[in-house]
Amino acid sequence: MRKYLLLIFFALFSFSATNAEIRWKLSDDGTLTISGTDMPDYRIFYDTNTGQTIAPWYSEREKIKKIVIENGVTGIGQEAFTYCVSLTSITIPNSVTSIGKFAFKGCSELESITILNSVTSIGEGTFYNCYALTSVTIPNSVTSIGQEAFTHCESLTSITIPNSVTSIGDWAFGGCLSLTSVTIPNSVTSIGESAFDGCKSLTSITIPNSVTRIEDTVFSGCSGLTSITIPNSVTSIGSIAFYDCSVLESITIPNSVTSIERYAFSDCSGLTSIIVEEGNAKYDSRDNCNAIIETKSNTLIAGCKNAVIPNTVTSIGHGAFDGCDSLTTITIPNSVTSIGEGAFKGCESLTSVTIPNSVTSIGDYAFYDCSVLESITIPNSVTSIGEGVFFNCYALTSITFEGSTPPRFEEDVFKDVNKSIPVYVPANSIEAYKKALGDYFPETSIRALQH
């Protein structure tokens, strides 16, 4: 039967145009031996554009425990060993110079692998979902680590990246739950989006001074990260870059940074210190405020539980205190005219907030999920309240509106707020507020404000 399969394989996969020829044999002990020269790329599903089809041993993949690639084979094809779920070891000769996309995807029992210094790149998704992989040796011949190369290698505890590597792709180590340490050399100039997303055991990381941008979501979900060093080579920090780094205690923004995108430090609930270095032309942390302020616009873009909003700030930016769940109270100075989208979203310990009479607009979801906020007073200066502003503020016991004209309400402003709580409004505006708030509160809840 095995000879018959081999004959079929030679008939289908002999590429005389390129002299490509691969021979394979699967022994009774589960050893797959591969010899020849150039291994083609494969696909789990037939690709009508390229003619690529599944590897000839794919139907036997669950029997494969060990792979021996003999010297002379120059490359490992795309998806060559995908879902070989019983594979525990592999021998790669130094004749191999390339490893194709998703070559070992889903090899969930593979524990260790040594990549020889003949290989120059680790391709996209090479070890994706290799859950048992605890050890991998990357040689100094490798210049790039592709996107998703080690995604969800949940047992991988440490990784040393050689100084030959210049780029780390998107999601390269995303979901490596056990990764506690990683060494990134100065040769690396780019680290892709979500490269370390969800590395919950990673406690510290130093970004080399060869990197100029911290990409979107790159350290998102690194909930064990206590310290991070941002070099003064960095000029921009992407959106949600440090989202949910919940035990990160301090952050220093070097004077080289000229761009910080929205929600960069959202849900960093453990932050107690935020400092912008002196001499930064774009941002400052004036008056030791423990916040990042965009200097020209006087917009506070990121704060922490110890932040004090200076009275020179005119707006609170998008997600400025998002997820700051240790914040219990905040005073907004009367210099502020707008509260941005999601500004205090998820501040689950916030019991009180004073909105000054200078504020004219409150952005979408500004106080969403402030689940212990007890009361709120909307001053007569406010003309618009965005979508879902008090959504899930189910601890509210009263709401007060001081304006004689109701502000413009977007959808779901008071969704999941107790409908029976009193809503106090100016006596001569009761009917107007009954109409404006009819979707949220019964008419009996709208009451005259007592002065």
PLM feature spans:
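Sec-dependent N-terminal signal peptides
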Residues: 4-13
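Surface-exposed repetitive/solenoidal architectures
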Residues: 21-85, 102, 171, 220, ...
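A generic local structural motif
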Residues: 52-55, 302, 409-412
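Short, aromatic- and cysteine-enriched interfacial helices/patches
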Residues: 13, 44-45, 413
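Sec/Tat signal peptide C-region and signal peptidase I cleavage site
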Residues: 15-20
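Structural signature of tandem-repeat unit edges
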Residues: 30-37, 62-75, 85-98, 108-121, ...
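Consensus positions within tandem repeat domains that build extended binding/scaffold surfaces
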Residues: 57, 77-82, 100-105, 123-128, ...
